[in-house]
A protein has these predicted regions:
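Short hydrophobic alpha-helices and adjacent helix-cap/hinge residues
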Residues: 2-4, 21-231
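Bacterial N-terminal signal peptides
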Residues: 8-18
């Protein structure tokens, strides 16, 4: 009789424990937000967009956030971009994300294909320019000349896109520098071989050539210059 009583108590305890586990882990529908950043994980500008989203997700159990940082040097052709997109889809849950957030114009190369994988998915583009261009130029780290530029407004006609434009104010910064340093006669821009830096170099050199011909301009690339040589 005592053994039956003990067995009953153990069974009830196990049953209660199982019910508590079920109660503490209800199946919830989680809306995932996919964030793709063309910048490094430590970039302050990129994090100013990412941090609020991740914070919101941490405070709401029905929202999840996935952040992917691109290594643009590792993407050399469209085949590698396609493979990268396949890896994205494999890492995410079976259900499509609720929306995709792109940070940095270079990340826009994924818009078209991800829209094919998840038709009409809401996309938020946070970029420095209101245009994009041929994927091949961006992947290979070449600036997009004016004749090849595609306005984001054209993409909005066929995709569910919202553009958050973050103007670089190149001309305004040049004017401010001239006011603060009246004796300035040369502008040096230090960048690398990524599309973003190459586009900045192209635009900056064109503006100086057209509006400030009295200024000398030089682009120093990390690809060909060591940090020590700058000092």
């Amino acid at each position: 009789m005592r053994s039956i009583f003990k067995a009953s108590i153990i069974f009830l305890c196990l049953l209660t424990h199982s019910l508590l586990l079920v109660g503490n882990n209800p199946e919830k529908k989680i809306d995932h937000i996919l964030i793709i950043s063309a910048y490094a994980e430590s970039n302050p500008w990129s994090n100013s967009f990412i941090t609020p989203i991740v914070t919101m997700a941490s405070q709401d159990s029905t929202i999840g956030a996935y952040t992917i940082y691109l290594n643009m040097f590792a993407l050399q052709n469209s085949r590698e971009v396609d493979k990268f997109e396949e890896n994205i889809a494999e890492k995410l849950p079976a259900s499509p994300p609720k929306m995709v957030v792109f940070i940095g114009n270079a990340s826009f190369v994924f818009c078209d294909n991800l829209n094919k994988i998840w038709p009409d998915i809401p996309m938020l583009l946070c970029g420095e320019r209101e245009y994009t261009g041929p994927d091949s130029l961006i992947i290979q780290g070449h600036a997009i000349p004016p004749k090849l530029r595609i306005p984001i407004s054209n993409l909005q006609k066929k995709m569910n896109l919202t553009m958050m434009y973050a103007n670089l104010y190149i001309e305004e910064n040049l004017q401010l520098m001239k006011r603060l340093i009246p004796q300035m006669n040369k502008v040096v821009y230090i960048g690398d071989a990524t599309y973003m830096c190459q586009q900045n170099d192209f635009d900056l050199s064109e503006i100086i050539k057209e509006k400030h011909p009295e200024l000398e301009y030089q682009f120093i690339s990390a690809q060909t210059t060591s940090t020590d040589s700058l000092f």
